Amino acid sequence: MAKIDASKLELTEKVVHIARVAKVVKGGRRFSFSALVVVGDGQGNVGAGLGKAGEVPEAIRKGMEDAKKNMVSVPLIGTTIPHAILGNYGAGSVLLKPATKGTGVIAGGAVRAVLEAAGVSDILTKSLGSANPHNMVNATMAALKSLKRAEDVAKLRGKTVEEILG
């Protein structure tokens, strides 16, 4: 998979989750913030990143930088994905199913943010297991990374698309 140059893309960013976290030290608690951010161009390129800092804006900025480093390309067929897939990360699993035009994005918060940033506008999803935003975002990213077009699979197997699809 070729590395995506985020500087050449018109990216939209969405903050999925901000958490105030505490480190307990001898003198009490030290608070900092973590921000889970998703960036995408709406044309099949999407990335997710985690930023941590003492202040919220700095955590968001770091999260955006991390997301731009972790961009992946998603094979889209029109406004949906080529086939159903299950993505796993930690205790979170996400089932993604292609949908007909006009269905819309049927997904919960963290999964929806990733899919909208990727440019998927018709899809059915089901979140299984953990509802933790970090796990949901990473499970969705894992599923999107695993998607393959029928043409690519046919080429790998040395067959025609008709033979693959039956």
Swiss-Prot record:
Family under the similarity heading: Belongs to the universal ribosomal protein uS5 family.
GO biological process terms held by the UniProt record: translation
Origin superkingdom: Bacteria
Gene that specifies this protein: rpsE
This protein's record includes keyword Ribonucleoprotein: yes
InterPro entries: Ribosomal_Su5_D2-typ_SF, Ribosomal_uS5, Ribosomal_uS5_bac-type, Ribosomal_uS5_C, Ribosomal_uS5_N, Ribosomal_uS5_N_CS, Ribsml_uS5_D2-typ_fold_subgr
GO molecular function: rRNA binding; structural constituent of ribosome
Domain description: The N-terminal domain interacts with the head of the 30S subunit; the C-terminal domain interacts with the body and contacts protein S4. The interaction surface between S4 and S5 is involved in control of translational fidelity.
Keywords of the record: Ribonucleoprotein, Ribosomal protein, RNA-binding, rRNA-binding
Domain S5 DRBM stretches: 11-74
Keyword Signal included in the entry's annotation: no
Function of the protein: With S4 and S12 plays an important role in translational accuracy.
Descriptive protein name: Small ribosomal subunit protein uS5
This protein's GO CC annotations: small ribosomal subunit
Subunit and partners: Part of the 30S ribosomal subunit. Contacts proteins S4 and S8.
